């Protein structure tokens, strides 16, 4: 089992016993009945005691959207910030305060529309923040417009004749930005969700988690193919590092590389065992993880969940601290007043 304290070496540790109740605020939870956000919140609150971090050293930053109400409901420091800018704010916190465990809560609209630029650069820089993207493939807060992840042809209030847009694949986007940790999970699979949260907390650097989240009001059953017991075994591909990739009701299907480096589903029994894929989440080159992400399709025929990529590299805050320390050793402590005064000043008159 991963140790969610490992990436928190500079964050204070508490020996005080914590429970889920300690991380519940006094605020009334105000999401629509049946919203998948309730399940995510409960899993998150029940996981937080594992971090053994004092509440005052835990910070949750969100943008704008239904999911972004989550900081109100967790008894810690938090910030309900500007639309799309949560990764930028979290970057400043994580880079300047390594004694904090910083989590970002965002949605498919907040992160991938107005916030897309901030998201990819936080991932590229490998800032030590954990980003949870609640993907319901719709704008819920503004009452049901299409989002950057809505499928092509989606009829909504803002696309009455069907969306013309090709949707973002959040996993492909994160891997393309060379995020060092990329995973997907589902709101209704609490055990899997908690396991992914644990692994993300254990990772030093930026962690990106896409969570399929059902919106029962404006996009109900958007992920029914991968959540209903009657269909999920045929379509969900569970990724476990070092394990053969098998799926299907009887585990009879596998994956292998086809032409041009793409992955294809094949009958495992009728294939050369050496050609079948064993999952390697630790591959340094992101090409393999990207190929996995391209299995996605609008009908969820083959949908991997789990950790796609877990390839550690130095985090931005570590590199920044080392650079500052080296500069201090070479030039001494800085003088802010002298810096502001500058060397090229003069008086007039």
Kindly give the residue locations of the regions a language model identified.
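Thiamine diphosphate
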Residues: 2-140, 194, 323-349
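Flexible, low-complexity linker and terminal segments
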Residues: 2-17, 26-27, 217-349
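Conserved thiamine diphosphate
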Residues: 19, 147-200
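Short beta-strand segments
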Residues: 61-63, 105-106, 130-135, 210-212, ...
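Glycine-rich beta-alpha junction loops
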Residues: 64-66, 136-138, 189, 212-217, ...
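Active-site-proximal loop->helix
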Residues: 116-123, 141-154, 173
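ATP/pyrophosphate-binding catalytic subdomain of soluble kinases
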Residues: 180-236
């Amino acid at each position: 089992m991963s140790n969610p304290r490992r990436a928190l070496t500079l964050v204070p540790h508490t020996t005080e016993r914590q429970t889920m109740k300690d991380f519940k605020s006094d605020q009334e939870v105000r999401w629509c009945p049946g919203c998948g956000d309730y399940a995510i919140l409960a899993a998150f609150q029940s996981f937080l005691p594992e971090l053994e971090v004092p509440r005052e050293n835990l910070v949750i930053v969100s943008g704008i959207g239904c999911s972004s109400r989550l900081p109100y409901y967790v008894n810690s420091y938090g910030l309900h910030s500007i639309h799309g800018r949560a990764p930028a704010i979290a970057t400043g916190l994580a880079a300047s305060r390594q004694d904090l465990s910083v989590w970002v809560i965002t949605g498919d609209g907040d992160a991938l529309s107005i916030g897309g630029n901030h998201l990819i650069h936080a991932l590229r820089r490998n800032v030590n923040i954990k980003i949870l993207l609640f993907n319901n493939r719709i704008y819920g807060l503004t009452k049901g417009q299409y989002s950057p992840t809505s499928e092509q042809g989606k009829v909504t209030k803002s696309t009455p004749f069907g969306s013309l847009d090709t949707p973002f694949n959040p996993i492909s986007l994160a891997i393309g930005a060379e995020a060092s940790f990329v995973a997907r999970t589902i709101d209704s699979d609490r055990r899997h969700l908690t396991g992914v949260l644990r692994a993300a907390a254990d990772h030093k650097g930026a962690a990106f988690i896409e969570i399929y989240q059902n919106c029962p009001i404006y996009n109900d059953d958007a992920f029914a193919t991968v959540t209903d017991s009657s269909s999920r075994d045929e379509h969900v591909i569970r990724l476990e590092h070092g394990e053969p990739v098998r799926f299907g009701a009887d585990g009879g299907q596998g994956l292998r590389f086809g032409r041009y480096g793409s992955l294809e589903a094949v009958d495992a029994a009728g294939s050369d065992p050496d050609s079948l894929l064993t999952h390697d989440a630790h591959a340094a080159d992101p090409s393999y993880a990207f190929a996995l992400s391209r299995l996605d399709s609008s009908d969820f025929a083959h949908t991997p969940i789990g950790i796609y990529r877990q390839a550690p590299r130095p985090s931005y805050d570590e590199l920044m601290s080392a650079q500052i320390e080296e500069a201090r050793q070479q030039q001494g402590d800085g003088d802010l007043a002298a810096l502001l005064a500058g060397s090229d000043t003069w008086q007039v008159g």
